[in-house]
């Protein structure tokens, strides 16, 4: 898995949205 995938999987919902929409 990529670093982004790991961050999304490990991070909470808030971080998930931030990672998805923020980037």
Swiss-Prot record:
- Which superkingdom is the protein from? Eukaryota
This entry carries the following GO cellular component terms, namely:
mitochondrial inner membrane
The protein's annotated catalytic reaction(s) are: a ubiquinone + NADH + 5 H(+)(in) = a ubiquinol + NAD(+) + 4 H(+)(out)
Keyword Membrane attributed: yes
Q: How does it sit in the membrane?
A: Peripheral membrane protein
**Main localization, broad class:** mitochondrion
Gene Ontology MF annotations: NADH dehydrogenase (ubiquinone) activity
Q: Does the keyword Membrane apply?
A: yes
Which Enzyme Commission numbers does its entry carry? 7.1.1.2
Kindly list the places in or outside the cell where this protein is found, as annotated in its UniProt entry.
Mitochondrion inner membrane
User: Keywords assigned by UniProt?
Assistant: Membrane, Mitochondrion, Mitochondrion inner membrane, NAD, Oxidoreductase, Translocase, Ubiquinone
Q: How does it assemble?
A: Complex I is composed of about 45 different subunits.
Biological role stated in the UniProt entry = Transfer of electrons from NADH to the respiratory chain. The immediate electron acceptor for the enzyme is believed to be ubiquinone.
Q: What is this protein called?
A: NADH-ubiquinone oxidoreductase 29 kDa subunit
């Amino acid at each position: 898995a990529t670093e982004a995938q790991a961050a999304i999987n490990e991070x909470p919902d808030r971080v998930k949205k931030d990672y998805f929409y923020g980037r």
